[in-house]
């Protein structure tokens, strides 16, 4: 029986910032937020902070987001390693073209002991969970049987690596969308804001909405001056959404 696994989102990389020693400027932030402020001030050479209303990193970046000068957000990035996510969810995730992805390959990694990610709609109903388990176990059994027969059929292929790859890429066609996958995702701050705005909405599928909110929580800790305008709320059905009054890109 396949193991049911929960979503796990781990921040594994973030932007560092090294201030040029010849620029007479300092800020009260570091990392990505400092880099974004530096990029914005570089546009106007406003190193002396002439406007007291934007003298802090937080107030400066708030102004940047309010006026839509979002290109400076593209200099800083964050990378997550995401596990416990279904193949159907990553099919939606990879539509965000400004992210960079490295995903588990079903052509090279055997799926005979793959895990399963439950659709959120069935999680609290034992009968529905049992039906999903039954269906996914049957699919995996078909995968194993098909893989064995394909490897036998392709036995005359001299290259063992190629033979296994050809067998797996054909056998994977019977695996369900609920199969767990694992993926590394890198995005700049602007791309992450857009992803959260689109996918943490109540109109998004619940699984990818959970992913967006899990990313938001870590991004808000990493760069509160960039992501702190998003508020997380709980809907009547118990699921969460995130909204911001400063989202202008659709």
Curated annotation (Swiss-Prot):
Active site: 199
Residues spanned by motif ThyX motif: 95-105
Keyword NADP included in the entry's annotation: yes
Positions bound to dUMP: 92-95, 103-107, 172, 199
Biological processes, Gene Ontology terms: dTMP biosynthetic process; dTTP biosynthetic process; methylation
Primary enzyme class: transferase
Cofactor(s) needed: FAD
EC identifiers of the protein: 2.1.1.148
Keyword check for NADP: yes
Chain segments annotated as coiled-coil in the UniProt record: none
HAMAP family to which the protein is assigned, alphabetical: ThyX
Subunit structure: Homotetramer.
Family affiliation: Belongs to the thymidylate synthase ThyX family.
Protein name, entry field: Flavin-dependent thymidylate synthase
Species name: Mycobacteroides abscessus (strain ATCC 19977 / DSM 44196 / CCUG 20993 / CIP 104536 / JCM 13569 / NCTC 13031 / TMC 1543 / L948) (Mycobacterium abscessus)
Gene name as annotated: thyX
């Amino acid at each position: 029986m396949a193991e049911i696994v929960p979503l796990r989102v781990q921040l594994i990389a973030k932007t560092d910032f090294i201030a040029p020693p010849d620029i007479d400027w300092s800020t009260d932030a570091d990392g990505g937020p400092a880099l974004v402020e530096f990029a914005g001030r570089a546009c106007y050479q406003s190193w002396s902070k002439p406007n007291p209303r934007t003298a802090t990193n937080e107030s400066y970046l708030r102004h940047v987001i309010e006026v839509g000068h979002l290109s400076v957000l593209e200099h800083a990035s964050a990378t997550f390693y995401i596990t416990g996510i279904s193949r159907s969810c990553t099919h939606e995730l990879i539509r965000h073209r400004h992210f960079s992805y490295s995903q588990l390959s079903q052509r090279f990694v055997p799926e005979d002991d793959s895990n399963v990610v439950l659709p959120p709609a069935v999680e609290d109903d034992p009968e529905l969970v049992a039906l999903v388990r039954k269906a996914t176990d049957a699919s995996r059994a078909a995968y194993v049987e098909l893989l064995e027969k394909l490897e036998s059929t392709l036995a005359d292929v001299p290259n063992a690596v190629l033979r296994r790859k050809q067998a797996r890429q054909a056998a994977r066609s019977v695996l369900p969308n609920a199969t767990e996958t694992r993926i590394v995702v890198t995005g700049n701050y602007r791309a992450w804001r857009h992803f959260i705005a689109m996918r943490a909405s109540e109109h998004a599928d619940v699984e990818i909405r959970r992913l967006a909110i899990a990313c938001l929580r870590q991004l808000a800790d990493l760069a509160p001056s960039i992501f702190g305008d998003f508020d997380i709320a709980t809907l009547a059905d118990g699921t969460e959404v995130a909204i911001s009054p400063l989202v202008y890109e659709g």
